[in-house]
C-alpha cells in the first residue's frame, strides 16, 4: 500500500494527472497480440482492422479490460511493424476487404477474396502472396469507387484537408515509390529527392495521390469503428508508437530536417547482447525538433489518439539518449552528459504528455540509467516489468518480489522480442529452476500446466497497475491452441533477418477462441 500511495502522489503532481484520472489506478488486465496474427472467417490473408471487433468481444468475455496491439503503420513490403515507411499512416494491408461497400463489383472479386481467405488458413502469414494480391485488389476497387463518385464525398474531402500535414507527403511518396518499382530512396534520382520538384510531381501523380489518400481514409474509418466498439464494451485499446522510423520512409524523405542520415541508432552491448545491435534507423536532429516545439511528434500522437486510449512508448530511453553507430561501426551514447540527456528527455516528454489524451506506458527494458528511470517516474510514465528479468543485478542477482514492483508499471511475462514463457523455460533451464525456486514451485524440465497457470495468475497479482501478457502465453494453457513447435510461437528474434520473424499466426480463429469454453474459464480464473 505505501508503494501505491507514493505513486498516487506522483500522479497528482504530474502533467498527465487528468489522463490518469480517466484511466484510474485500479488493477487493469489485458492481452497483447499483433494485428497481423489474428484471423476470422472473413480475414483475407492477414489480420484485418475489423477483426479487432470480435477480438475485443472475446477479451471482455474473459474479463480483460485492455487489448494491446503492435504498431499498425504502413510498412510497405516489410514484415516488421517497427520498420514503417510513415510515422502516421495506417497499413492498408489490414483493411477488412469483406466489409468494403461495392467490393463485389471488382472483377473476379469472389475468386480473389476466396484465394486471400485461404491464405489465412496457413500456419504463418505469407506476405509474399498477401501483399501483391491485396495491392491488385485495391487498385481495381479504387476504380469502382471512382465510378461511384465516392472520392467526392464530403467526408473524404474533410479527411484530406484535416490530415494534409502527413497525408499529402505520404501519398506523393507512395506514388513516386510505386513509379520507381519500390526502389529504396538512396537509389532515387535527384529529380525525386530534390523537394523543389514537388509541385511537378503533384501534377504528374495526381491520380495516384488520390488513390493512396483514399486507402488511408478507408483505414481511418475502419479503425474508428473499432475504437467506437471498444469504448462501448469498456475496453481500452493500447497502441504502439515506434520511437524510430525507417531510413526508407516518407518522413526521412519529406521531413528530412528532423533526421540525420549519416549515423544510425541501435542498442549498446549488454547482458542480453554482447555486441550490441545496429538497427540501421536514422537518428533525430533533436535541435530542429525542439525548435518546432516537437510538432512532428505531436502530430503522430494526435492521429493515434483517434484509435487508442493507451500507448506503448517504444524504447522510451531514446527520448533521453540514443546509442549511435557511426559509419565506421563505432558506438557512443548521444548525448553523453547526464545533465544534457535528462534536460533533453524531460523537455520532449513534457511537451508530448501535455499534447495527448492517451496514457503512455514506457518500454524501458535494457540498459537504462537510474536517473532516467527516476525522471520517467516523476512524470508518472509507467515502465515495463518482465519477471524473468526483474532481478537484483547490482547485488545478489535475486529475483525482485512481485509485491515490490513500482505500481507505475506494466507486468508482462514475455514480449514480442523474447521467447514465450514455455520456450524460455525449455531453453534456459538454470534460470527456470531459480525462478521456480523463487516462486516456491516444484521445478520440472518442461513447464507443467500447474506451474504455467500459477505463473500467469501471479503475473496478474503483482503490484503493477497494469498486467498484460502475450496471447501466446495464455493459449499455451490449452496445447490444442498452439503449435507443436514452440519456436513457431515466437514472434521475433531481435538482431536476425529470418523468414520466421513477424509471421506468427494465432492457431485458432477468433470464432474458435470465443467458443473454447475450457480456455475462457481458465482465463477468467486468473484474476
Curated annotation (Swiss-Prot):
InterPro entries: Glyco_hydro_77, Glycoside_hydrolase_SF. GO terms for cellular component: cytoplasm. Keywords: Carbohydrate metabolism, Cytoplasm, Glycosyltransferase, Transferase. GO terms for biological process: carbohydrate metabolic process. It is found in: Cytoplasm. One of its GO terms (molecular function) is 4-alpha-glucanotransferase activity. Pfam families: Glyco_hydro_77. The keyword Acetylation does not apply. It catalyses: Transfers a segment of a (1->4)-alpha-D-glucan to a new position in an acceptor, which may be glucose or a (1->4)-alpha-D-glucan. The keyword Chaperone does not apply. Its EC number is 2.4.1.25. Belongs to the disproportionating enzyme family. PANTHER family: 4-ALPHA-GLUCANOTRANSFERASE, PTHR32518. This is 4-alpha-glucanotransferase. It comes from Chlamydia muridarum (strain MoPn / Nigg). The gene is malQ.
Amino acid at each position: 500500500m505505501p508503494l501505491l500511495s507514493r505513486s498516487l502522489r506522483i500522479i497528482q503532481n504530474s502533467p498527465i494527472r487528468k489522463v490518469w484520472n480517466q484511466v484510474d489506478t485500479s488493477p487493469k488486465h489485458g492481452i497483447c497480440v499483433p494485428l497481423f496474427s489474428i484471423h476470422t472467417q472473413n480475414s483475407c490473408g492477414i489480420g484485418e482492422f475489423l477483426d479487432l471487433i470480435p477480438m475485443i468481444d472475446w477479451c471482455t468475455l474473459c474479463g480483460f479490460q485492455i487489448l494491446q496491439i503492435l504498431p499498425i503503420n504502413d510498412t510497405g513490403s516489410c514484415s516488421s511493424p517497427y520498420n514503417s515507411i510513415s510515422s502516421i499512416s495506417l497499413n492498408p494491408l489490414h483493411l477488412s476487404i469483406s466489409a468494403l461497400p461495392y467490393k463485389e463489383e471488382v472483377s473476379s472479386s469472389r475468386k480473389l477474396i476466396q484465394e486471400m481467405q485461404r491464405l489465412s488458413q496457413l500456419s504463418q502469414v505469407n506476405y509474399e502472396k498477401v501483399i501483391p494480391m491485396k495491392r491488385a485488389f485495391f487498385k481495381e476497387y479504387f476504380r469502382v469507387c471512382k465510378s461511384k463518385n465516392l472520392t467526392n464525398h464530403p467526408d473524404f474531402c474533410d479527411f484530406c484537408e484535416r490530415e494534409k500535414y502527413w497525408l499529402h507527403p505520404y501519398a506523393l511518396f507512395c506514388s513516386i515509390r510505386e513509379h520507381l518499382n519500390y526502389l529504396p530512396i538512396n537509389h532515387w534520382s535527384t529529380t525525386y529527392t530534390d523537394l523543389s520538384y514537388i509541385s511537378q510531381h503533384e501534377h504528374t501523380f495526381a491520380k495516384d495521390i488520390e488513390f493512396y489518400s483514399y486507402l488511408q481514409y478507408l483505414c481511418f474509418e475502419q479503425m474508428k469503428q473499432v475504437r467506437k466498439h471498444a469504448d462501448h464494451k469498456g475496453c481500452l485499446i493500447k497502441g504502439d508508437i515506434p520511437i524510430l522510423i525507417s531510413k526508407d520512409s516518407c518522413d526521412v524523405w519529406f521531413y528530412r530536417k528532423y533526421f540525420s542520415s549519416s549515423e544510425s541508432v541501435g542498442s549498446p552491448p549488454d547482458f542480453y547482447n554482447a555486441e550490441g545491435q545496429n538497427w540501421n534507423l536514422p537518428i533525430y536532429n533533436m535541435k530542429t525538433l525542439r525548435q518546432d516545439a516537437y510538432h512532428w511528434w505531436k502530430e503522430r500522437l494526435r492521429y493515434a489518439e483517434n484509435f487508442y486510449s493507451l500507448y506503448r512508448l517504444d524504447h522510451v530511453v531514446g527520448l533521453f539518449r540514443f546509442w549511435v553507430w557511426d559509419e565506421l561501426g563505432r558506438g557512443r551514447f548521444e548525448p553523453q552528459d547526464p545533465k544534457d540527456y535528462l534536460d533533453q528527455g524531460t523537455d520532449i516528454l513534457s511537451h508530448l504528455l501535455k499534447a495527448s489524451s492517451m496514457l503512455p506506458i514506457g518500454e524501458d527494458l535494457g540498459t537504462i540509467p537510474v536517473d532516467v528511470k527516476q525522471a520517467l517516474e516523476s512524470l508518472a510514465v509507467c515502465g515495463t516489468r518482465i519477471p524473468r528479468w526483474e532481478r537484483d543485478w547490482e547485488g545478489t542477482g535475486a529475483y525482485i518480489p512481485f509485491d515490490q514492483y513500482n505500481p507505475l508499471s506494466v507486468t508482462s511475462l514475455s514480449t514480442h522480442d523474447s521467447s514465450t514463457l514455455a520456450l524460455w523455460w525449455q531453453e534456459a533451464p538454470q534460470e527456470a529452476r531459480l525462478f521456480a525456486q523463487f516462486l516456491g514451485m516444484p521445478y520440472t524440465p518442461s513447464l507443467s500446466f500447474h506451474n504455467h497457470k500459477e505463473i500467469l495468475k501471479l503475473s496478474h497479482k503483482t503490484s503493477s497497475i497494469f498486467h498484460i501478457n502475450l496471447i501466446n502465453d495464455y493459449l499455451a494453457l490449452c496445447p490444442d491452441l498452439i503449435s507443436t513447435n514452440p519456436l513457431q510461437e515466437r514472434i521475433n528474434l531481435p538482431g536476425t533477418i529470418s523468414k520466421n520473424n513477424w509471421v506468427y499466426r494465432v492457431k485458432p480463429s477468433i470464432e474458435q477462441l470465443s467458443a473454447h469454453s475450457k480456455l475462457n474459464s481458465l482465463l477468467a480464473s486468473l484474476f
